[in-house]
Swiss-Prot record:
Residues 90-110, 161-196, 211-228, 337-349, 952-970 have a biased composition (Low complexity). The keyword Transmembrane helix applies. Residues 86-118, 160-271, 318-354, 939-1031 are annotated as: Disordered. The keyword Protein biosynthesis does not apply. Residues 244-264 have a biased composition (Acidic residues). GO terms for biological process: cellular response to phosphate starvation; phosphate ion transport. It comes from Dictyostelium discoideum. Residues 319-336, 1013-1022 have a biased composition (Basic and acidic residues). Belongs to the SYG1 (TC 2.A.94) family. Residues 1-483 form the SPX domain. One of its GO terms (cellular component) is plasma membrane. It is found in: Membrane. This is SPX and EXS domain-containing protein 4.
Length: 1081
């Protein structure tokens, strides 16, 4: 069985967000090693210390390069990461500190690629020229005036190197000449962080920085010219410009705008990428850059020497040559060092000045208003990798597990303290209170079992992921396994099992007469047994079959036996009663289906609706009761239709729907504990709270109930408005009678009451929170309905024309109100269409419960259609003489209201869940029925404990004083030992007598205190679980989860080890990549 299926089968719905994200970790593994090591489709990380010196590798001998490759770098200093991406057109100039440009592999027609990494450079040097071992010439800039001159420069380069191997005595002059030539190159302005360089005269030349081995290989086709896109993205970076260049440009020409596509800020373990798009604000970029500037003094000082030297060499500002020629004389080395130092002092900045220069250039970039026009957006993204995601997932599971264990332990201690409280209080020692304590032990035992299953399932998932990752990277996998084994969820001695064992024995001691076997049977999970589930399933299936049969019979009798031409006299009222009674039945049935989906999808609807968590509930049971009422409704309707075909019974037909409504009301309000009495009472309480608005606080269940009442009012209001407002003179007699009800003042008032209750709730919420959105925004939605209802009444009462001013106003209010209601449904209640600029998932939310987004788009479309259903009815009314009071038409219209209310509540609960996942997965305490008395008892107990501690302290002080007196007397006795023996014996006997008299009050005092605290003797009846210091039941043991400093240090060191090994492994994987090999010339 796959772990994915195992996780879905055993997951606890309201803990769904706390489990291991197995699919996410698997996707990271597949994404990180997709087709590796044969392609570079994904972005990888390499060491800056190695890639940045790629162009100066010729300064070192082959032996030195080999030693560096084996050691993994030039030195052991921290490294800066740059991103490798093969989508660009040409190799880039890595700019340290701020912009780490992309180093790319540019494939030519013959497959030639550029090289990155010392290992391939080492092999290529051996292939090209075995005589380069003694070379010490500095790197020359290969200046490509056009693509045809590349091979000439390469040949001249090798000729020069071969000549230098034969003439060792003139190395010093060559070094000086090369330094002077490189110093002259400092006047060049690097215009693009890729490969576009500007000459002093402002002309653009396509140049390649570095050695011939970083350019296209010998024998390959000429290098193509820069693409128009690259030329368009030319920039003048002040970070790559010396002070001399800046002075010249201030005199001669203006600085060009800076266009940055990507800034990578490296903060050791945190790699932050700043991406600029066409939209955004300058403040975001300034904020991000300032945040990075603050980290420079901490991180860059360690890297400044190496990176700045490499940067200066890479940009043409050469500090000097590192000569590794073993055959050179010591005098030549000294001369070279002196000359190099002189050149460095004259032409370059020291490390501190270089650091100050770079920070000042950052500020210059931020303060340049013209350049900021091209950097209008800045978003921070964190690069994803497996090791970081794995550590985050482990920490999430571990912290949640330990937190819930400690919460459960606190509840167990509280329940144990209730036992002596109830044993001494006869008035509160009722069956209900005793059952509360017993149920509390059972709930905590079941909760601990769930925690243990949660731990085992997550550990199994982590092991599965590590086994998969071990095939790709054994080093990092072993480090991650060490980190997992050091967490608290991986401990062998589980405190959860110990606490479960203690709860079981306490339950056996106080509730089953020390019968542990009986306690085990009673304390097990309280879920419905298989027999009850099978009974529910059988009943549901039977009721569904009965409903289908009765529904078919109703349709058949209505078409063939119902008198359509001469219906009963009271048929409009009868059909209205049937429709009104059907709406709450269908809403209750749909709620049972919604609760089933919520439970399966992990939405904690129990907490959102504020149901009591200690009550047993099942969506199947709700569905069963809903189907029972549906069956009764279909029976009554079938009886009415069948009886209407007989003329003798038509006079009494109105009694059938009336009796059915009365029976339904009686069942709903009857006080006996049958037919889900807790749910029925909960509904009645919420209806009372809705009616009491705005004088009572409003919670989410009250909002839910007001929506249910709104669906009834919306139904009555829409039907009467559409049928009666227009073409009143052309209505049939039955329709006129139907519309006359709307002209009665009481009916519009009744229709407006649900809207008024909803407005009152919104204003109450605004009074409590002072938030205009979403409370006043939601109230406006109901205000539109009230205004339309008032205009409807006025139009029926005073206007007889088709298009009077009042009717036009009514029509306009309905159109505007429908659009606004749709917007409020989406934005206020479902959380859609919000934050266009910052929400990447617009028009949806960022957090969604269901992964298939088409579900939400279907819901949006359906809500829009249902909000404009009145317009469809209006079109039918104006375009035909179809009777809109037809029972079948009104029945289907009522179904649309049920669909709207069901869909609205379903996604409203889903939005409420995802917007506050931490709140709705929190630990909820069941209220104590005797909380006030118990709190008073605990307060008195704390006071007695404090008095007892004070007494014990005073007694200890008295004992210490007595002991000091005895010691003083003993010293006197030893000092007077020269006297006669009789005196000595007398003093000693008197001291012993005094000592005995001083100790007896302490013993008496202890006995007195024990008698004085005899009222606490009931606490000692469970002395095997008592804490001798506090008097509370003790659940502490040596086996417990700790958050000490040693544990945190171990975790921190393991995280550092994972990060260090990951950087080395990534470097080795990239440097050994086949796509990075240099093709032979």
């Amino acid at each position: 069985m796959k772990f994915r299926d195992l996780l879905n089968d055993h997951i606890i719905s309201h803990w769904r967000d706390k489990y291991i994200d197995y699919e996410y970790l698997k996707d990271l593994i597949d994404r990180e090693y997709h087709n590796a090591p044969n392609s570079l489709n994904n972005s990888m990380m390499i060491d800056m210390s190695q890639s940045i010196n790629n162009t100066i590798a010729e300064q070192y001998s082959v032996n030195d390069i080999s030693s560096m490759v084996t050691k993994g770098g030039i030195n052991d200093s921290p490294t800066t990461d740059i991103e490798v991406d093969e989508t660009a057109d040409s190799p880039a100039i890595p700019s340290p500190i701020i912009s780490h440009s992309n180093i790319n592999s540019n494939n030519n027609n013959n497959g030639g690629t550029n090289s990155v990494g010392f290992s391939h450079l080492h092999r290529q040097l051996n292939r090209q020229n075995s005589n380069l071992k003694n070379s010490s010439n500095s790197i020359n800039l290969l200046k490509a005036d056009d693509s045809n001159n590349i091979e000439k420069h390469v040949k001249s380069y090798f000729d020069q190197r071969n000549n230098n191997n034969n003439i060792n005595n003139i190395n010093n002059n060559n070094n000086n000449n090369s330094n002077n030539s490189n110093n002259s190159n400092n006047n060049k302005t690097i215009k693009n962080t890729r490969n576009i360089i500007a000459d002093d005269d402002g002309g653009n030349e396509d140049t390649t920085l570095g050695s011939p081995f970083s350019s296209p290989s010998i024998g390959s086709p000429p290098m193509s010219s820069p693409s128009p896109k690259m030329l368009k993205q030319e920039l003048h970076s002040p970070l790559l410009t010396s002070e001399k260049d800046e002075d010249e440009e201030e005199e001669g020409e203006e600085e060009e705008d800076i266009e940055m596509e990507q800034l990578e800020l490296d903060d050791h373990d945190k790699n932050t990428t700043i991406n600029m798009t066409a939209n955004g604000s300058r403040g975001n970029l300034r904020k991000g850059m300032n945040q990075f500037v603050k980290t420079i003094p901490q991180n860059i000082k360690q890297l400044n020497s190496q990176i700045s030297n490499s940067f200066l060499k890479f940009g043409g500002m050469v500090k000097g040559d590192k000569s590794n020629d073993k055959n050179n004389d010591k005098s030549n080395d000294k001369n070279n060092n002196k000359n190099n130092k002189n050149n460095n002092n004259n032409n370059n900045l020291n490390d501190e000045d270089n650091f100050d220069m770079m920070t000042s250039q950052i500020e210059k970039v931020l303060n340049n208003k013209d350049n900021m026009k091209l950097m209008e957006s800045c978003t921070f993204t964190t690069k994803e990798n497996f090791q970081t995601a794995f550590v985050d997932q482990v920490n999430k599971v571990d912290s949640f597990f330990v937190e819930r264990y400690r919460k459960t332990k606190e509840k167990c201690v509280e329940l144990c303290n209730m036992i002596p409280f109830l044993s001494t209080n006869e008035q509160l020692r009722t069956i209900r209170n005793i059952e509360f304590v017993k149920q509390g032990f059972q709930d905590n035992y079941h909760y601990l079992e769930s925690l243990e299953a949660f731990k085992e399932l997550n550990i199994k998932g982590f092991k599965k992921v590590l086994e998969k990752y071990e095939k790709k990277n054994r080093i990092i996998s072993s480090e991650c396994r060490k980190y997992l084994e050091n967490t608290r969820i991986f401990e062998n001695d589980s405190p959860v099992r110990f606490l479960s064992h203690r709860i079981k024995h306490l339950y056996a001691r106080y509730f089953t007469g020390n019968d542990v076997k009986l306690a085990s049977n009673q304390i097990k999970t309280y879920a419905e047994d298989e027999r009850f589930q099978k009974y529910n399933l059988f009943t549901i299936g039977l009721l569904i079959g009965v409903c289908i049969v009765l529904g078919i019979q109703v349709v058949f009798n209505y078409y063939y036996y119902y008198p359509h031409e001469q219906p009963p006299i009271d048929s409009p009222l009868a059909w209205l009663l049937f429709r009104i009674s059907l709406l709450p039945i269908l809403l209750g049935t749909m709620f049972s289906l919604m609760s089933f989906i919520w439970e399966k999808s992990g939405i904690n609807y129990v907490f959102i609706f504020e149901f009591k968590p200690d009550h047993k509930r099942s969506p199947g049971r709700y569905l069963k009761y809903g189907l029972i009422f549906n069956t009764l409704w279909l029976l009554a309707l079938n009886l009415y239709i069948d009886s209407s075909s007989h003329q003798n019974t038509t006079r009494y037909l109105i009694l059938i729907p009336i009796v059915f409504v009365l029976i339904t009301l009686i069942i709903g309000i009857q006080p006996f504990p049958i037919m889900a009495h807790r749910t029925r009472f909960w509904v009645l309480k919420k209806i009372v709270k809705v009616v009491s608005a705005p004088w009572v606080p409003v919670r989410f269940p009250d909002f839910f109930m007001s929506v249910q009442l709104l669906s009834l009012g919306e139904f009555l209001f829409n039907i009467q408005s559409m049928v009666c407002v227009f073409n009143y003179s052309a209505l049939d007699p039955e329709e006129v009678k139907f519309c006359s009800q709307s002209r009665f003042f009481a009916l519009p008032v009744l229709n407006a009451l649900p809207y008024w209750w909803r407005v009152a709730q919104c204003f109450r919420r605004y009074y409590e929170t002072r938030q205009f959105f979403p409370h006043i925004t939601s109230a406006i939605r109901s205000i539109f309905s009230i205004i339309a209802l008032v205009l409807n009444y006025i139009a029926l009462e005073y206007s007889q024309h088709d298009w009077s001013i009042i009717k036009i106003a009514w029509f306009g209010i309905n159109v505007v109100g429908s659009f606004y209601k749709f917007y409020a449904d989406m934005s206020v209640d479902w959380g859609f269409f919000n934050n266009y600029k910052t929400n990447p998932a617009w028009p949806l939310r960022e957090k969604l419960v269901f992964k298939k987004k088409w579900i939400y788009y279907v819901a949006i479309t359906l809500d829009f259609f249902l909000r404009f259903t009145w317009l469809i009815i209006f079109s039918i009314r104006k375009g035909s003489k179809h009777r809109l009071d037809n029972p079948l038409f009104l029945f289907f219209f009522s179904l649309t209201e049920v669909v709207w209310a069901t869909q609205f509540i379903f996604f409203r609960v889903e939005s409420e869940h995802v917007q506050s996942p931490d709140t709705y997965s929190s630990f909820q305490d069941i209220p104590i029925p005797f909380s006030q008395e118990y709190n008073n008892y605990m307060d008195e107990k704390k006071k007695r404990r404090k008095r007892k501690q004070k007494q014990s302290k005073s007694n200890n002080n008295n004992n210490n004083n007595n002991n000091n007196n005895n010691n003083n007397n003993n010293r006197l006795h030893h000092n007077d030992s020269s006297n006669n023996v009789e005196t000595d014996e007398t003093i000693t006997s008197s001291n012993n007598t005094d000592s005995s008299h001083q100790k007896q009050p302490l013993t008496h005092n202890r006995h007195h205190n024990h008698n004085h605290n005899h009222q606490d003797h009931h606490d000692l009846s469970i002395n095997d679980h008592m804490n001798p210091d506090t008097g509370d039941i003790n659940f502490d043991s040596k086996i417990d989860y700790k958050d000490d400093e040693a544990y945190n240090l171990r975790q921190s060191s393991l995280r550092t080890s994972i990060s260090r090994n990951a950087s080395h492994v990534d470097l080795g994987r990239v440097s050994s990549h086949n796509d990075l090999n240099i093709s032979r010339g």
